[in-house]
């Protein structure tokens, strides 16, 4: 969501960011200032503002669970004709009631005059770029693990500890 906001504010779009976390909304407001309108994620805010959307990007992530359906069919019908929904959460079931997985070969479909783009594994459309991005993000962790060993890395870095699933034959 934040990366989409960077691009959208860069082209002077009116950007609403919806999140459940007030702390996260404050962080984003500090970063973007008056370029964004932060909103608490609730049905009233979503219903009030969705009719203004030309582009809705659903970037919901609940680690280890399906994405909640935040956008109802009724909300979709209130959107402008030709509006676009990009449901990035489609890999976790999607956050829009009318979303269904599509492919790179057949990426879009229309429901109630609203275009839906719900391609699972969106980074797969740019494999070289996504591989470089993944390597850039994971390399520091790989180097730390190689330099410190897994036990020191786990004890000195909360990110490693949060990512631990199995250790010495035990599910953590």
Language-model segments: residues:
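Glycine-rich phosphate/diphosphate-binding loop of Rossmann-like nucleotide-binding domains
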Residues: 1-61
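Conserved active-site and cofactor/substrate-binding residues in soluble primary-metabolism enzymes
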Residues: 3, 19-23, 41, 48-55, ...
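Short, glycine/charged-enriched secondary-structure capping and boundary segments
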Residues: 8, 30-33, 53, 70-73, ...
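Structural beta-strand/beta-sheet cores of well-ordered domains, especially the beta-sheet scaffolds
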Residues: 11-13, 34, 67, 81-84, ...
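Hydrophobic/aromatic beta-strand patches that form the interior of the parallel beta-sheet core
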Residues: 16, 39, 84-86, 117
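Short, ordered loop/turn segments at secondary-structure junctions
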Residues: 20-22, 43, 61-62, 89-95, ...
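ADP-ribose/adenylate-binding Rossmann-like module
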Residues: 58-111, 115
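Adenosine-phosphate binding glycine-rich loop
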Residues: 90, 95-172
């Amino acid at each position: 969501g934040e990366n989409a906001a960077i691009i959208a504010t860069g082209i002077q779009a009116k950007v609403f960011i919806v999140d459940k976390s007030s702390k996260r909304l404050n962080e984003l407001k500090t970063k973007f200032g008056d370029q964004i309108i932060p909103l608490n994620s609730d049905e009233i805010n979503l219903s009030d503002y969705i009719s203004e959307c030309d582009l809705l990007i659903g970037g919901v992530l609940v680690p280890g669970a399906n994405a909640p359906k935040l956008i109802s069919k009724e909300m979709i019908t209130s959107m402008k004709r030709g509006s676009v929904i990009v449901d990035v959460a489609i890999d976790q079931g999607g956050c829009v009631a009318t979303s269904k997985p599509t492919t790179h070969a057949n990426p879009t479909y229309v429901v109630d005059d609203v275009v839906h783009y719900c391609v699972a594994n969106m980074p797969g459309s740019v494999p070289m770029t996504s591989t470089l991005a993944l390597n850039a993000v994971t390399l520091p962790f790989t180097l730390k693990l190689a330099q410190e060993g897994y036990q020191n890395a786990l004890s000195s870095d909360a990110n490693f500890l949060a990512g631990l699933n199995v250790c010495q034959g035990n599910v953590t």
